[in-house]
Structures are given as structure tokens and as C-alpha cells.
């Protein structure tokens, strides 16, 4: 819903829809939004929606592939990529715009070894995607803490999250920031 509201002629940048539910794919396709695909179930829902709602066989639906690099909640694991990429290559309507993952503990140096393993695995997985698809795919893994602590892993872009609101995920950085607003949301998945 937010993506459609933002669109409406006012936002001209690409809009990624995180965690799309199955009822939203018709709206996503009609409004040229770009869904995050984090499982084969969600990919199949996308293909079904394309078959139902896309009338122009040349229309490109941009997607963003979430990779599981260690959180084990959402995302494709390395062993799932060959099947996913085969399906994507055989669907002329689908184009991968980006692949991404999320760092579980970038704000805490206790987890630095794990974070570095996540970054290394992400680099391997994103290379598999780019090599198989044979076209450039944007890559991003850094959150607010990662931007500060792991600048070498900036890849093509970063996702400034809570830092955007003047809240540091690393304690010593907080003294240099000011709160700029209030953040409210709904729980979309447990």
C-alpha cells in the first residue's frame, strides 16, 4: 500500500517492496513496484501474478533477491540459487535489479567474525547470481552499523536504516547525532 501511495506521480525512483504478501502482487505489477523475493514460494506467487496480470510479453518486472547469509529467517541459501536462477533466466518478464542480505550483528564487535563470514558468503552468492544472469545486478548488504564499521563492504549501495532517524546503532556515535522524528510501524511477519 505504501509503495502505491508513494508512487502516484510524486516518487520517480524505483521502489522495492519488502516482504510482499500474496495479495499484493497484482498491485505491485500494476504500479511498477519491485518486489523482494525471499523464497521459492514467493517467486512462484510472482510468476502466477505475471501470468495473470501482465499482458505485454516485453514488460520487465524488476525484482530484488534476498540472500540468507546467516540469519536463517528469510532469503535464499547458496544451494537454492541454481534452481532459482534457472527459472529467472527462462522467464523473459523477470529481471533481477539487486541482490541483498542483512548483517545480524554489525553493531557489536563480539560478532565481527560472524559479520565478516556473512560478507564473504554474500560476495560469493552475488557473484554466482551475476555470472549466471550475465548482466549487472546491484549488490547491497550494509545496514546503519555496517556502514560505519565495515566500509569495505559497501558494494553498489547501502541501506541506512535507523541512522536516518538520528539513532546510532553504535553507542559512541550517538553523542554526535540528534533525534529527528518518531518511527511507527506495524508488525508484518513473525
Regions found by a protein language model. Give the residues of each.
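Positively charged, low-complexity/disordered segments
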Residues: 1-16
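Short beta-strand/loop segments at the ligand-binding rim of alpha/beta enzyme cores
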Residues: 15, 60-62, 133-139
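Catalytic beta/alpha-barrel core
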Residues: 15-25, 31-45
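Short, charge-rich binding segments
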Residues: 26-29, 48-58
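Glycine-enriched alpha-helix->loop->beta-strand junction motifs that scaffold or abut catalytic
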Residues: 29-35, 62, 152-159
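Active-site loop/helix belt of alpha/beta enzymes
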Residues: 43-54, 69-190
Amino acid at each position: 500500500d505504501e509503495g502505491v501511495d508513494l508512487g502516484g506521480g510524486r516518487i520517480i525512483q524505483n521502489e522495492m517492496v519488502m516482504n510482499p504478501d500474496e495479495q499484493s502482487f497484482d498491485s505491485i505489477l500494476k504500479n511498477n513496484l519491485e518486489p523482494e523475493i525471499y523464497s521459492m514460494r514467493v517467486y512462484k506467487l510472482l510468476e502466477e501474478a505475471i501470468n495473470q496480470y501482465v499482458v505485454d510479453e516485453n514488460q520487465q518486472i524488476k525484482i530484488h533477491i534476498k540472500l540468507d547469509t546467516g540469519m536463517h529467517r528469510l532469503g535464499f541459501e547458496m544451494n537454492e540459487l541454481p534452481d532459482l536462477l534457472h527459472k529467472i533466466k527462462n522467464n523473459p518478464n523477470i529481471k533481477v535489479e539487486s541482490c541483498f542480505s542483512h548483517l545480524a550483528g554489525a553493531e557489536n564487535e563480539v560478532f565481527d567474525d560472524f559479520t565478516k563470514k556473512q560478507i564473504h558468503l554474500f560476495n560469493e552468492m552475488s557473484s554466482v547470481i551475476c555470472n549466471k544472469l550475465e548482466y549487472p545486478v546491484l549488490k547491497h548488504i550494509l545496514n546503519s552499523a555496517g556502514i560505519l564499521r565495515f566500509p569495505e563492504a559497501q558494494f553498489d549501495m547501502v541501506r541506512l536504516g535507523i541512522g536516518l532517524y538520528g539513532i546510532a546503532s553504535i553507542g559512541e556515535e550517538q553523542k554526535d547525532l540528534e533525534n529527528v522524528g518518531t518511527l511507527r510501524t506495524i508488525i508484518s511477519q513473525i
